[in-house]
Regions:
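Cell-envelope/extracellular polymer assembly enzymes that use nucleotide-activated donors
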Residues: 13-15, 39
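Short, well-formed alpha-helical segments that are part of the catalytic scaffolds
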Residues: 17-36
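Short, structured coil segments at secondary-structure junctions
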Residues: 36, 57-59, 139
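Conserved donor nucleotide-binding strand/loop of the catalytic core
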Residues: 52-85
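Catalytic-site signature of metal-activated, phosphate-bearing donor transferases
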Residues: 74-75, 81, 92, 99-262
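Short aromatic/hydrophobic "clamp" motif used to bind/position activated sugar donors
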Residues: 89
């Protein structure tokens, strides 16, 4: 192989990066869908189940990130990305499946001279046992050039990417990540406090008042139930849309509370 051919090959390689902690429930199924990528990196936060045994079975590259008191995976994202050796990185959660069509699309994309430096990938999610239209396309910024990307250690943070970012059109129904987690009402309500706490930092400069407590939850509900088609999902869709409104109400309330505390 000539030096030019080697460089060309290196430019068209993809590392799949997965952060794990006690992820044995779905990990084997996930790894089956990504095993044919150029590299699979598992960044584990000291799992106590057989997560690492599964990763070794599939020949994954394994790095360990000390869990400490962390309850989220974001602090370990950058460690996982840095452990990858390929130019391009696809970040996949330990409960997300990658379709053959998505894989083909990504390899085709990086072969183009005008390929973007980052790509939003749509994701299908479940609630109360069924796919939810009100969540879709739930875009995730998961594909990018490794050396041009930094991932903040903040819950639900998007990576910071140097360069142009594009989206896979939501109409490509065969390309979304398939999120296996089947969220129940209890699990989603249990996450509200954790997730909305992050909204305080993200939106600390927003001057929300009483009006925002009314219109923001309503807009969130309307978008989920009407605009995104939650009405097609029956009672589950209505409950899901209500949850979206409740989430927004709690988030705005916390932002207002934080501002009031700082004024005292």
């Amino acid at each position: 192989m000539s030096n030019q051919e080697y460089i060309h090959q290196a430019e068209h390689r993809i590392s799949v990066v997965i952060n794990t902690y006690n992820a044995s429930q779905h990990l084997a199924e996930v790894l089956e869908t990504v095993k044919d990528f150029d590299e699979v990196v598992i960044c584990d936060m000291e799992s106590t189940d057989n997560t690492l045994d599964i990763a070794r079975k599939y020949g994954c590259k394994i790095v360990i990130f000390p869990r400490g008191n962390y309850q989220i995976c974001e602090p370990a994202r950058q460690t996982a990305i840095d452990a990858a050796s390929c130019k391009w990185v696809l970040v996949v959660d330990a409960d997300e499946l990658v379709t053959p069509e998505l894989k083909q699309y990504l390899y085709s994309l990086i072969g183009k001279e005008d390929a973007p430096q980052g790509l939003y990938v749509p994701r299908k999610s479940r609630f109360m046992g069924r796919f939810m239209h009100c969540f879709y396309p739930d875009y995730q910024l998961r594909f990018f050039i490794r050396k041009d990307t930094v991932w903040p250690a903040i819950i639900h943070a998007d990576p910071v990417i140097k360069g142009r970012i594009e989206k896979i059109p939501a109409a490509h129904a065969d390309m979304p990540l398939d999120h296996l987690a089947d969220n129940s009402i209890a699990s989603r309500m249990g996450k509200i406090n954790q997730y909305t706490a992050n909204e305080i930092e993200k939106k600390k400069d927003r001057n929300y008042g009483m009006a925002a407590l009314f219109y923001r939850p309503f807009v969130r509900f309307f978008r989920a139930y009407i605009q995104k088609g939650g009405f097609r999902d029956g009672k589950e869709g209505f409950i899901c849309a209500c949850y979206e409104g409740i989430y927004q109400f709690v988030a705005v309330s916390k932002i207002i509370e934080d501002r009031m505390k700082k004024r005292k």
